[in-house]
Amino acid sequence: MNRRAFSTLGAPGADLDEVVRLARTGRCQGVELRCAVGQLVYPDMPATEAGRLGAALRRAGLAVPVLASYVQVAADDSGVVERLARHIDLAARLGAAQVRVFGGGADRADGRREQAVRHLARAAPLAEAAGVGLALETHDTFLTGAEVAAVLEAVGSPHAGAVWDAVNPWRAGESPERTAALLGPWLRHVQLKDVASPTDLRPVPPGHGVLPLPSVLAQLGRLGYGGWISLEWERAWYPDAPPLADALPAFHRVLDAG
């Protein structure tokens, strides 16, 4: 059985006690920590504070499969590798296994993939030294498994992998079968969610929307994927959505049925 987590994107502003309570009452063994200003974890978090938080989560019996950064690896920016290094160090202090990154680079007319490859290739040795992975999400300018796999194949490092956001490749027209086949060699983490429609991305409880979640789970089974599956409940972006605690039972029902 896959280990289950939730993203703190679903509980914006939650403190440590609230995160631990949500995990315990919500039957989750791990927490995907969103790294953003004003949140429990933030990019300039002091090393000692990060270490204390990581230790507190471990005492609570919780793992941190992913530190969800907002670093855009295809950005035309000389500071990308430095930001990656800072997030790698933060992840190591928290005990996080992966640093989630985005592609970005929407302002680049061309060379976006090459820029992402360069930045990830330069940061991969830093991740290796820290015992942390880098994981490029199917998101923004790299929505599909095809786009993410092309980057990771060119990087060619075991310390650079993929996060499969289950909605994005599907809404871009890529089937779960195709996404799984493309990302299989690099898959490090899966974000599960459901939406009202391909053009209405408001969160709905898993199994109550239009995403073919049984197909996603079937493909993960065919891959033999034994890693984490996290509920990404986007309440930070949709504040009218029900609380995360209300969505977790549906998340478990979908996984139990799969």
Language-model-detected regions and their locations in the chain:
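Histidine-acidic metal/acid-base catalytic patches
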Residues: 1-29, 54, 58-61, 95, ...
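Active-site-proximal loop/turn and secondary-structure-junction residues that shape catalytic pockets
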Residues: 10-12, 35-37, 70-73, 100-107, ...
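Active-site acidic/histidine proton-transfer and metal-coordination neighborhood
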Residues: 17-18, 56-63, 73-162, 169-171
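Short, conserved active-site loops that position catalytic residues or coordinate cofactors/metal ions
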Residues: 26, 30-37, 62-69
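Glycine-rich, proline-tolerant flexible connector loops at the mouths of alpha/beta enzymes
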Residues: 32-54, 104-110, 201
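Hydrophobic residues in well-ordered beta-strands that form the structural core
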Residues: 33, 64-66, 136, 164, ...
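Metal-dependent catalytic neighborhoods of phosphoester/phosphodiester hydrolases
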Residues: 42-50, 76-81, 110-113, 240-241
